[in-house]
Amino acid sequence: SGAGWVGLDNFAQLFGSRLGRNAIFNTLTYVAIVIPASVGLGLLVALGLHGLAGSLPRITNTLKAVYFLPVAATLVAMAVSWQMLLHPSLGLVNTWASALGWPAPLWLSDRDLVLYTLAVIGIWQTVGYNMVLFLAGLAAIQPSLYDAAEVDGATGGWSRFWLVTWPMLGPTTLFVLVVTAANAFRVFETVATLT
C-alpha cells in the first residue's frame, strides 16, 4: 500500500479527459493571442516613446511609468481593479457600454468571452515589461548605423526600421518572445484570481 510508480499515467489521464483537452486548448488559444499582441504592442509603444524622448523627455518618462505600472502591481491589486472595471452592473466598462446603447456582457462569467477578456488583461500586464526591454534594445542601436543606412538610400522611417532597427532588435526580440511565452503559459494565477 506504499506509493507506486505511475509513469506517464497522469499525462494519459489529462489528455484522455474532455476537461483536460479543453484546458490545453484554452491555454494554447490564450498564448496564441497574448504573445503576438503583447510583443507587437510593446514594440510599437517602445518605438513611439523612443521617438518622443528627444523632444518631450518629461512626457516620455511619465508615459514609461504609466505603461510599466501593471508590471509592478501585485496580482491581487490588479485582479481587484479588473473585477471592479468589469463588474456586470457597477463596472466602468459596462456603464460606458450601456451609455452607448451596447449590451453589457458578463466579461468574467460568459464562457464565450472570458478567454478573450483574460487575454486582454494578459496583454495589458505584459506590454509594459516588453516596452522596457525594447527601449533598452533601441538605446543600444548606434546612431551611426542610421547614418550609414541613409547614405545607402534608406531615407524614410519605414525603410530605416526594416533595414536597421528591426535587424538590430533581433536578440532583444528573441528574449522578449521567450519571456512573454513563459509568462503566458503561467496564466493560472490570473484565472484563479479573476474568475
Predicted regions and their residues:
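A structural signal for multi-pass alpha-helical bundles of membrane permease subunits
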Residues: 1-195
